[in-house]
Amino acid sequence: MSKTNPRLSSLIADLKSAARSSGGAVWGDVAERLEKPRRTHAEVNLGRIERYAQEDETVVVPGKVLGSGVLQKDVTVAAVDFSGTAETKIDQVGEAVSLEQAIENNPEGSHVRVIR
């Protein structure tokens, strides 16, 4: 079944294009995960990002970031969607960006960690 969300469809196309053109295999992996049913998309709390992310790293969440937990590391978090509290907490110590912006800033996909 095709995706009915036009933003998600164009995001998947952009991810695949970035993976083909710049060789960033991480973007192809994220595109494959987003093509699966929505119930399998990641829902990641800030505590998990704090546990697994390194300083000055880009964390990609193929789904939604939720606001439970504390984030103290200076990381850039890229996701399809953020809860209101998650975006506020991330912006206090790091940067919350959309996946579209992450592809623009880093088309090769270097120093990226996918968390789900």
Swiss-Prot record:
GO terms for biological process: translation. InterPro entries: Ribosomal_eL18, Ribosomal_eL18/eL18-A/B/_CS, Ribosomal_eL18_arc, Ribosomal_uL15/eL18, Ribosomal_uL15/eL18_sf, Ribosomal_uL15_CS. Pfam families: Ribosomal_L27A. Keywords: Ribonucleoprotein, Ribosomal protein, RNA-binding, rRNA-binding. Disulfide bonds: none annotated. Belongs to the eukaryotic ribosomal protein eL18 family. This is Large ribosomal subunit protein eL18. It comes from Haloarcula marismortui (strain ATCC 43049 / DSM 3752 / JCM 8966 / VKM B-1809) (Halobacterium marismortui). The lineage of its organism: Archaea, Methanobacteriati, Methanobacteriota, Stenosarchaea group, Halobacteria. The gene is rpl18e.
